[in-house]
């Protein structure tokens, strides 16, 4: 399964599968007291993402074990009160959630083997509406990472619009351009080197 600790270190959320059917049960533990909270969410995918101390995002699966939806849970409330924040009806696509290292944004990625689409929400507004950065395009995959460049907030955008080995560009926060040629290129596509991922740190 998956696991995650809140930034303060107080709560641990973890998911387990004891039958092998890849449908997980999520529990939350208070690490300060050792107490298991009553919150129990059954029949979900393995992934989970914290947003502050109060909210947890997780994925549910359909009958074919495809993660098709992302849900928001408030710690200490009934599972029946959980809110579905994203649904992917296209059976070719799988949905998943994450947050960046700085916990600035929550991300929902819906991806297939050949294309992807990303939705974002500020972590300080966990009950807000996710926004699509760029609608899916056939045979184009992209990923984004939040970074501060020269003190300015930016998106680092990894995409394969210009070739199968991917290219790295950057742009201001907000929706991505439909034409990715408008990104400022940081690392161009190369035939001999493939870019798999990007991470941002203060000096790198």
Residue ranges and their predicted role:
Residues 1, 19-21, 29-46, 73-94, ...:
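Multi-bladed beta-propeller domains
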Residues 1-15, 42-59, 90-109, 137-158, ...:
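Conserved beta-propeller blade repeats
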Residues 6, 50, 73, 100, ...:
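Conserved Ser/Thr-centered positions that define the repeating blades of beta-propeller domains
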Residues 7, 65, 101, 128, ...:
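Structured loop/turn residues at beta-strand edges in well-structured enzyme cores
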Residues 16-25, 40-43, 59-69, 79, ...:
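A flexible loop/linker signature enriched in serine peptidases of the S9 family
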Residues 70, 106, 118-119, 130-133, ...:
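Generic structural signal for nonpolar/small residues that stabilize regular secondary structure
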